[in-house]
Structures are given as structure tokens and as C-alpha cells.
Regions:
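Long, well-ordered mid-to-C-terminal structural blocks that present hydrophobic/aromatic surfaces
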Residues: 314-317, 321-393
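A short core secondary-structure module
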Residues: 202-252
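Alpha-helix capping/hinge segments and adjacent helical runs
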Residues: 378-523, 538-540, 547
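Basic/polar N-terminal segments that are highly enriched at the extreme N-terminus
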Residues: 1-18, 497-563
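Internal helix-loop-helix
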Residues: 55-153, 204, 210
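N-terminal-proximal low-complexity accessory segments that begin disordered
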Residues: 5-54
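Glycine-rich beta->alpha junctions and the first turn(s) of the following alpha-helix
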Residues: 254-349
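Gly/Pro-rich turn-and-neighbor structural signature
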Residues: 124-196
């Protein structure tokens, strides 16, 4: 639902930073304990990135995109903690994530959105199976609180896993997976559960307000203790976070400070739960093993579609920087066919996987239990698979159009060296209309994004974030209606015979492997999207500045501000 004129009670980036000072988590980074996450230098790029999601929601220009009205409360909330109720919501979420990732590379807070939408779906599913509203009521009470307080939630999903060939209950070390160790605990007069175990990869863990603990796989009956979904404050007793720095803050390398990742980056943390108490009000399920797979599937589908937008924002950075580098080198891609081909390939890759995200929104449909909207899983997984494998081509193209200068430049200290600076500025200038300083600044920017630590980091999170390529291929095959295509050809070949003796389509055989998957609607009015359903909500003050709609020249104008 699009935002109305309700005045949002939302935090700014500074408010967010101040709120972190009120939290006292047990966090370690670089071998030492952190006194204040908000003031820890190693986390500043990550805090800056999340902070942008707060400031953009308060800007008149972006508020219609970055905020929405929560249909269960009527309150204006940040888009990244909102439950989707239409294809328009899915599209606006996609545009919002692309917008913030153009600026930050990875804004991280969008994981909150993906998790709350998945938990809403599984809560309603459990209630429908039991004929109650208990789980939905409990989750909505929690959701409204975190929306009203404008909190950012981390997703603690990926367990340490131990021996990958064994299921959770078969592990020699039970703490390889987070699990329930006590179901009837009482703490300060409040009833709840106690959990222990390890979540190995938690995005932005140190500077989250709370963690959403979720199972990372399908569970069997024997794994019931490991089937737990709950919310844990970041400074809950018994929770320890062992983190890595976000970006490259203050790092002094032989080639100088990182132009992008000194400002924006992402920390991750290993989260160790040692008998952490969770009140029942914050427990969304505990022991309902048969629903773990559905939660994992729902979250993965939401998250893979969202990742499409995040990496499209990164693609925008490479397109703009690549064009600037061509210009600085004295080339016009419009005249140089080999550069034009490379730039068009980069544009095609970026907009190609983004189009899959758009299609996943358009063909999205209401979940049968919660009635909230779910992206189409086929297009969501195809788009994520494309970006996961094409990220390396995106880097290659940036390297091709830029030239070797991006990794061979002397360090920036030489720019100010009276013995070398003036001469370097003379001999390393190419296009007479582009100052030497701008050329080398753009080169170092591209190096930071593609050829250094940060470039490798973007490659790995693109490949494995949200699940491995093998997992995406499995979901594509599982959900794609191959059976419809088989039956189409069977009909054209007149292999089926109707009761009256006329040619007919071969009957669907549930036992036949290649016709198992059948799905109407990709090309008919009775499919996933009902005719007349709003696809894109009206955003008159924003639509001309949506990240996927900006003219090329205008999109390039903002880039030097990042350098």
C-alpha cells in the first residue's frame, strides 16, 4: 500500500546512530571487545549505509517510495519493514532498494523486509493448519512495535551447520545449529524459551537493533528442537557477536584510502547464543518442524528478488563510472565500437536481471494464508541466478573500458609530492577537457569497487548471498511449468485422443516426471495477476527520479559526488 499524507514518526540517520548507543551488545572485532558500536570506527561504513535508509525516508523527494502504509495498523512505516499487499508494493520495494544501493552498494536493511514478509506468511500458515489466529496475532503485535520504533532487524538464518552430510539432530556438536534447550523457562516472572547455538553469517549484526532467528533448512520430526523462529534484542544476555569490519574504514594501503568503501560497507558477524532467554511474545514458532521448509522457501524467494535490485544499484555505479573512465581516457563509446559493445553489454546485464525482478513483481500473487504478496519464484530465482553468475562479467567490463591504470596508479600521496606531483599530472592526463585529478579519482573509484578487497567481496556476496546458484537452479526447475510446455507439444503432435475420437492434448499424468510442474497464467487472463490489478502505484513526485528510469546523462551527474 502506498504511503498517504500521514506524518511518519520515523528516525533519521542520526537518530538511528543515537539509538545504537542505547544498546549494549557484546561485540568483538579485530581481536578486541567493542565499547560502543555507534562509535566504533570499524563499523562506520555499515552504519552509514543503514543510516541512508532512514534519511531517504524523511526526504520529500523519496518518501513516497521509501515509506508505505501498513495495512494492519494504518500507520506510515519505512518501506523496508512493510508487508506487501500488491504487485505495486513489490515493484516499489524493488525501486527503493535499487535507489539506496546506488548510493551505498549494499544498504543491508532490506533483509528486514524479506524476513518479516516470510514470517507473516508462515505464521498465517500455522494458524490455518490449527484453526487459530494465535501466531499471526503474536507476530503482528511484534511487527507493529518494531515498525513504530523504526527498528532495523538482522536476519540470523545461516547456521554454522557442522558436518554438512548430517542433519541437525545428528551433529556431534549440537551448537552447530541454534536450537531450543528449554521450553518452559521463567525469567523475571515472564515465560519463554531458552536457545543455544551458532548463526555463522549475519549481515550487519553489530549495528542491528534485534535479530530475527530463523531456521536455514527444511527440518524433520527429529529436528523439532532446531525448528525455532524468534526475535532477540541485540544486547540480550548470552548473545556474543564476533564481527569483521565494514568496508575499509581508515585502511591505509599502498594505493591510498578506498574512495567508496571507506564510506559505505557491510559488516557480518558470527552470532553465538549461549542459553539466551526469549519471552513467548517474541517466539513465532518453536518445534513446528513441518513449517521450517516453508519459511526458508518464502524468505529465499523474497530475498532473491530483493537482491536483484541491490545488485542493479551496483550495476548503475559501474555503468556511470565506466562511462566517466571512457571520457577521461579520451574515448567516446558512441564512436568507439569496441567500447560501445562493452558498455551495452554491461547495461544489458544490469537491466536484464532487473527485468526479472520486475517480472517477479508483476506475476507475484497473494499468499494463500496471509494474503500478503509473494514474488513469482521463477523470475525471482532466474534474476538472482543471472546476477550471481554475471557479476564477474560486470567487473570484467569495468576493467576493459577503464584500462590497466586502475591498478597501476601510484598512491595519492604522490599527487601532493613536490618532487613528483606536477609531472604526474602532466603525463597522466588524457582528455584535455578532463582534469588529471578527475581521471585518477575515477580510476581509483573503479579499483575500489572491482579490483580490490571490496570488489572480491561484491563477487562473493553476489554469488552466494541468498543461497548458492545450485539452490536457485533447483527452485527454477521445481517451479517452472515444464509440464505445460510438454503438453503443448503433445497437443500439436496430436498424441492425445479425446473420448469422441478427436485429437486432444495428452492427459496429465501425475506420475510422469516431465509433466509434474504445471502452472497457468504466464500468458492468460486467469493467471498470477488478475486483469486490472494495479501493477505500479502512482508516485507522481518520485517516478521521474526512480533509479531505473533516470536518463543516462542525469544518472552520471551524481557520481562525482561519491568520489
Amino acid at each position: 500500500m502506498n504511503a498517504t499524507d500521514n506524518t511518519p514518526q520515523l528516525m533519521s540517520a542520526q537518530d538511528y546512530r543515537d539509538s545504537l548507543r542505547r544498546c549494549k551488545p557484546r561485540v568483538f572485532v579485530d581481536g578486541r571487545q567493542v565499547d560502543s558500536v555507534a562509535d566504533e570506527r570499524a563499523f562506520q561504513p555499515g552504519i552509514n549505509a543503514v543510516g541512508l535508509t532512514y534519511d531517504f525516508a524523511l526526504q520529500t523527494r523519496y518518501a513516497p517510495l521509501m515509506t508505505a502504509v501498513q495495512h494492519t495498523s494504518g500507520r506510515t512505516v519505512n518501506r523496508l519493514s512493510h508487508l506487501n499487499t500488491s504487485s505495486g508494493d513489490l515493484l516499489n520495494k524493488l525501486e527503493a532498494v535499487r535507489l539506496i544501493c546506488q548510493e551505498t552498494g549494499c544498504a543491508q536493511r532490506y533483509l528486514t523486509h524479506d524476513a518479516v514478509n516470510a514470517i507473516a506468511q508462515v505464521s498465517a500458515r500455522i494458524d490455518d493448519a490449527r484453526g487459530t489466529t494465535e501466531h499471526t496475532d503474536r507476530f503482528l503485535h511484534y511487527l507493529h512495535r518494531i515498525q513504530d520504533q523504526d527498528l532495523t532487524l538482522g536476519v540470523a538464518m545461516t547456521d554454522a551447520k557442522g558436518d554438512r552430510s548430517r542433519r541437525p539432530h545428528e551433529q556431534a556438536n549440537k551448537d552447530s545449529y541454534v536450537h531450543v534447550v528449554e521450553r518452559n523457562a521463567v525469567h523475571n516472572g515472564v515465560r519463554g524459551i531458552v536457545i543455544s547455538g551458532t548463526k555463522a553469517i549475519v549481515t550487519g549484526a553489530p549495528y542491528m537493533h534485534e535479530l530475527l532467528v530463523m531456521p536455514c533448512r527444511n527440518m524433520g520430526r527429529e529436528d523439532a528442537d532446531f525448528a525455532v523462529c524468534c526475535a532477540v534484542p541485540i544486547d540480550a544476555p548470552g548473545l556474543t557477536i564476533v564481527a569483521r569490519p565494514a568496508g575499509r574504514p581508515g585502511e591505509k594501503l599502498e594505493h591510498g584510502d578506498a574512495l567508496f568503501s571507506r564510506k559505505y560497507g557491510q559488516s557480518t558477524g558470527v552470532c553465538i547464543f549461549d542459553r539466551v532467554f526469549v519471552p513467548w511474545d517474541n517466539v513465532f514458532f518453536a518445534g513446528e518442524w513441518e513449517h521450517s521448509g516453508h519459511l526458508t522457501y518464502s524468505y529465499a524467494t523474497h530475498h532473491r528478488q530483493t537482491c536483484i535490485a541491490a545488485r542493479a544499484g551496483f550495476g548503475d555505479l559501474l555503468i556511470g563510472a565506466g562511462a566517466l573512465m571512457c571520457e577521461a581516457n579520451g574515448f567516446d563509446p558512441g564512436r568507439e565500437s569496441h567500447l560501445r559493445e562493452q558498455m551495452v553489454e554491461l547495461i544489458t546485464i544490469t537491466e536484464g536481471f532487473y527485468a526479472c525482478g520486475v517480472a517477479a513483481s508483476v506475476y507475484g500473487k497473494a499468499d494463500e494464508h496471509s494474503k500478503t504478496f509473494m514474488p513469482d519464484p521463477v523470475f525471482a530465482n532466474i534474476g538472482k541466478l543471472l546476477l550471481a553468475t554475471k557479476i564477474y562479467d560486470m567487473h570484467r567490463i569495468a576493467h576493459y573500458v577503464s584500462g590497466g591504470l586502475i591498478v597501476t596508479l601510484p598512491g595519492p600521496d604522490e599527487d601532493h609530492n613536490p618532487e613528483t606531483g606536477a609531472r604526474l599530472s602532466e603525463v597522466l592526463r588524457a582528455n584535455p577537457d578532463v582534469p588529471y585529478e578527475q581521471r585518477i579519482e575515477t580510476a581509483r573509484f573503479i579499483e575500489d569497487l572491482t579490483a580490490g578487497y571490496q570488489g572480491g567481496w561484491y563477487s562473493v556476496i553476489s554469488l552466494h548471498g541468498g543461497g548458492s546458484p545450485a539452490a536457485m537452479k533447483q527452485e527454477i526447475w521445481r517451479n517452472y511449468p515444464v509440464g505445460n510446455k510438454v503438453e503443448l507439444v503433445e497437443r500439436l503432435l496430436e498424441r492425445g485422443i479425446a473420448a469422441d475420437g478427436s485429437a486432444a492434448a495428452a492427459p496429465h499424468d501425475p506420475a510422469r516426471a516431465i509433466t509434474k510442474n504445471r502452472q497457468p497464467g504466464k500468458c492468460c487472463d486467469t493467471g498470477c495477476t488478475t486483469p486490472g490489478q494495479p501493477v505500479m502505484v502512482d508516485l507522481p513526485t518520485v517516478v521521474e527520479t526512480l533509479p531505473s528510469r533516470l536518463p543516462h546523462r542525469e544518472s552520471m551527474q551524481g557520481l562525482p559526488k561519491l568520489l
